[in-house]
């Protein structure tokens, strides 16, 4: 199979979908890899590294799309890429369709096969291709929250961990999954007063067992959230429903009840966000303020630490990419239940329920396209 890896062109997206080591593994399996020139530079990989691994370099994104049977990316195609995608071309990347109707309609119209990293799901309901970036984003959410809590960035002026004789900041984490767990580890390790809210009592018991004493757990309901946001210094939105729009758990009317200078970090922004006031931002302009509350809603947070993120992502995605290349997408999906759940849009059909529900589109069972 001919594999193409374009350079990411989303704002400040410095990750690349394939490392030189990953390219070498694909070539070793008998396939051809074409990298767009300088695609790996943001992650510290030179074109020469890819050539030494057996890949070929093409100067433009147009040439990569034109020659490839499968495109491997990090983030969803943006509007300028829509016209480059061919009928029957496989796209393997993060799509987050449920938060982007124009993207969904474009992919339905071009006849492509869209395999979304974020909905590849194991039998135990874990999401192996989302976990690495959730780990990165969860840890980064506390770094960013602590930074914007500083007065020079408009925050309340509180040191996250406090000092002897002065209490630490209060951190509220909504959602106890991978993002929430990693955020709690970071905030707890820095000495903050942390509360994790989740709907699953089983998950809360687990978190209560593994977290230090300064990390507490609480059942998620509107009353508890409404009360907790009033005194929080940093609020992390970490709620996920795989492939579907995130629920809006912090509503517009809660914002004025918060302290001026409170920092809200919505890690769920890729799926529409779990704050009603969320609007996607970029690394160039990461924050906005509503009622004196700072909102950080960058949709590609791990893009700011591309070396770590690229290595972590390729470790997870490469085995699946090789399966698709070796067997073709149909056979690979038929033989791998987890990969089959990654199919979202196939040749003009929506085959993932969450995407269909998000836009009121007809849903077809994935078996009809295999």
State where each predicted segment sits.
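Glycine/serine-rich phosphate-binding loop and adjoining beta1-alpha1 elements at the start
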Residues: 2, 8, 77-169, 298-300
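An N-terminal-biased, well-structured beta-alpha scaffold segment characteristic
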Residues: 2-110
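Hydrophobic beta-strand scaffold residues
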Residues: 33, 57, 91, 114-115, ...
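Rossmann-like adenosine-cofactor binding region
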Residues: 209-292
């Amino acid at each position: 199979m001919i594999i193409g890896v374009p350079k990411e062109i989303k704002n400040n997206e410095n990750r690349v979908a394939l490392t030189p080591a990953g390219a070498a593994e694909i070539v070793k399996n008998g396939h051809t890899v074409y990298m767009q020139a300088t695609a790996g530079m943001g992650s510290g990989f030179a074109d020469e590294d890819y050539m030494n691994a057996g890949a070929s370099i093409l100067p433009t994104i147009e040439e990569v799309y034109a020659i490839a049977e499968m495109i491997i990316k990090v983030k969803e195609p943006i509007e300028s890429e829509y016209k480059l995608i061919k009928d029957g071309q496989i796209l393997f990347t993060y799509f987050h369709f449920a938060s982007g109707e124009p993207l969904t309609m474009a992919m339905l119209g071009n006849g492509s096969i869209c395999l979304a990293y974020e909905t590849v799901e194991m039998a135990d309901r874990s999401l192996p291709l989302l976990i690495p970036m959730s780990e990165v984003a969860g840890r980064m959410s506390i770094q960013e929250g602590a930074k914007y809590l500083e007065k020079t960035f408009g925050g309340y002026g509180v040191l996250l961990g406090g000092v002897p004789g002065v209490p630490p900041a209060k951190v509220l984490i909504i959602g106890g999954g991978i993002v929430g767990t990693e955020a709690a580890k970071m905030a707890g390790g820095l000495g903050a007063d942390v509360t994790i809210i989740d709907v699953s009592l089983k998950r809360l018991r687990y978190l209560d067992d593994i977290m230090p004493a300064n990390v507490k757990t609480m059942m998620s309901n509107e009353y508890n959230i409404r009360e907790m946001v009033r005194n929080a210094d940093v609020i992390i939105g970490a709620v996920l429903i795989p492939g579907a729009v995130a629920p809006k758990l912090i509503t517009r009317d809660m914002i004025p009840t918060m302290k001026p200078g409170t920092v809200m970090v919505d890690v769920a922004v890729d799926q529409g966000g779990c704050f009603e006031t969320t609007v996607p931002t970029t690394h160039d302009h990461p924050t906005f303020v509503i009622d004196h509350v700072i909102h950080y809603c960058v949709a590609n947070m791990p893009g700011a630490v591309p070396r770590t993120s690229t290595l972590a992502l390729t470790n997870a995605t490469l085995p699946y990419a090789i399966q698709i290349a070796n067997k073709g997408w149909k056979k690979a999906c038929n033989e791998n239940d987890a990969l089959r759940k990654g199919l979202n849009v196939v040749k003009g059909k929506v085959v993932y329920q969450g995407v269909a529900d998000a836009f009121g589109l007809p849903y077809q069972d994935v078996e009809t396209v295999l």
